[in-house]
Amino acid sequence: MRTLIRFLILIALGLSAAGRAQSLPVTVMPVTARHGMVVAGHPQAAEAGRQVLQAGGNAIDAAIATSLALGVAEPYASGLGGKLMLLYYESATRRTYVIDAMDAAAGSLDVPAYVKRPAEQHAYGYGAVCVPGLAAGLWMAHGRWGSRPWAEDVQPAIALALAGFEVLPKSRDFFEEQAKKLRRGDAEIARLYLPQGRLPDAGTLLPNPDLAHTLTLLAQKGRDGFYRGPVAAAIAAAMKKGGGVVTADDLATYEARLTDPVGIAFRGDRIMSAPPPANGAAMFLAALKVLEDDSFDAGPLRSARNLDRLGRVWRLVEPQAYRLIADAPESRGYFEKMIAPDSIRALRAQAGALPVAMMQAPSPDQSALAATTHFIVVDGHGNIVCATQSLSVHFGAGVVPPGTGVVLNDSMSNFEFSDPKHLNYVAAGRRPRSTISPTIVFRQGQPVLALGIPGAARIPTSTLQVLLDHLVLGRPLAEAIGDTRFHFVIPWKPGEVETFEAEQSLPAAQAAGLRALGWKVVLPEAAGRGRLFSGVNAVEFNPDGTLTGYADPRRTNAAAGY
């Protein structure tokens, strides 16, 4: 199915594919189109969005179709039971908006009682579930900017849920990885995703009639089709039975937020990304400011010397962002202080002052592995949706309320539980932080690049390396995305060793050089597997008015345009 869809996209629609990037660990095949582009985490979702664009829908209409189809085709990564952070660039006004539809803790949460629960209950089962935000976020986007009837935008996801999505080989990897969770005890999730009690084979079509019914109610009644009525009642009943804390009132009163992005000036460009409670942008934007004047010896970025430079900076900005950026009114001010000239000069001096082993350890904190997906939609008017959506970890809390077909998030696990003074400490109605970082780059006021990536703590480091490779070292995006992916694991306890992680395509000489500089080097994954280092999705805006989509094959990503 995936091969067929890509063939139809490239051949039947008359698109051009740029040449392959040579001698790279991962080959990224750019797809260029003139009228519209969708890049998404599954080819059937990308195609759903493309069809909406070609039928006359705008970027928001196609984004709704793409988002909901992703929830069908990547049930381990995102969906109605999870969260959404959406950047929208409106070309007519040249303004960028953000819809924060992040999951929220229950409004009536008894914090002292919840904190005393076993840690496992913060991460699995109904007790781990926050109020989902995705449907409310899409509804808000449609109400402000959609051009077609809401029901028409939802219809492609309904059709996909009825017909079944194709389990691709890399999709099956995630099913296999989460087999224990799928078999753990929730009968509904096992029924849906372990047909006949077995992991689905690649090529299997997996329908979800219950989810199709939920989507039909959403199409008919708008946000109330999910947050009120029979779906909400089913969720609330399952929560009560399963020890959850989310009530029908919590669902009915949830609201997405319309807000503004955070951003920096960088070498004449303007880079905008996700605001608090997301903290990933604070990390890579601050790092970019520290490194703004660095030439990296004209490359390559992945030399031991340059990687050590990046790691020293990351060692400083990551703990700041975890400490200061959360769902708190003061976090925007903290971000502005992080990127203020005096702060950047101090960070630059500190990063170069000491061997990495002598740098002070940050305050203890934690960062979870996550299940996330990213998509980008650009329409013929130049409007852009750049959005990341997530269940927190793969298959979320591992539960599906009977009759709904909806996998619920485990976002309660993203809160801080040990320090009541921490900005991310669990609280009623608070939205837990996340590293998700949909990003748009502007040059002379015009968009030149939109990108995003799933991957939890690796989201901001991956975004940083792609931007540095492309914007500073001038590498084509296909090369920046296809080269060896890496990440810095910063210890949270004094005495722990700084760890540099990379795909196994990292040259041995550079690994040895990093070890000599004090880094522990771990190469956990072959290049292109995408389980840890995930896949970047991007759209480039070309001078001739065409759009080039980049779908990282580390995952099941696909680009579709016309």
Describe each model-derived feature in a short phrase.
Residues 6-16:
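Bacterial N-terminal signal peptides
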Residues 22-47, 51, 59-221, 226-228, ...:
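Noncatalytic scaffold domains of N-terminal-nucleophile
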Residues 62-66, 151-162, 234-236, 301-318, ...:
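Short, well-structured alpha-helical segments that form the helix of a local strand-helix-strand
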Residues 293-391, 404, 411, 512, ...:
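Internal maturation/activation junctions in enzymes
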Residues 258, 369-372, 394, 434-436:
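Short, small/polar residue-rich loop motifs at catalytic or cofactor-binding pockets
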Residues 78, 82-90, 373-377, 438-440, ...:
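Short beta-strand scaffold segments in enzyme catalytic cores
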Residues 430, 463, 472-529:
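Extended C-terminal subregions enriched in glycine
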Residues 72-97, 245-247, 383-449, 473, ...:
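Active-site rim segments in enzyme catalytic domains, especially the processed small/beta chain
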